[in-house]
Amino acid sequence: GKLLKTIDTHALGDRPRGIKASPDGKHYVVSLEYGDKILLLNSKFKALKTVATAKGPYGIAYDKSGKRLLVAAFKSKELQVFNGKTLKLEKTVPIGDRCWHFTFTPDEKNLLIACGRSHEVLVLDGTTFETVGHVKDLNLPWGIVAYPKAMGSLDFAK
């Protein structure tokens, strides 16, 4: 691909870890690990605002509807669920150690979270975000994608 723009995030928070377009294409969200923030950009990549997160935001993704924005805050061992439009925090869910990336299943019935230092993939209900299962004894799982493509921190389906 072609480089569209370089954005200096140093004043806002360093170490961008994830970027996702909103399903409607009007915004981008960026997780800033060394600022414990989400950076909201417009479609021309202008910074609009930052929103505080738990410690260590990493994986970031919207659900298909754009109503929810999820952030895996690995240092806090939390999954944060934000309102996809207002970016107000709606729910915090305890998760495992070093949970970096996640994906919804294609039907969005479940959310799968790769938890590296817990050596497992957590299976959460896709609506309540309660833990419904575990895939254990894995060797440092870092990322996860679903097939057919789904909404997640490493994949994007429309």
Residue ranges with predicted function:
Residues 1-158:
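Predominantly soluble domains enriched in secretory-pathway, periplasmic, or organellar proteins
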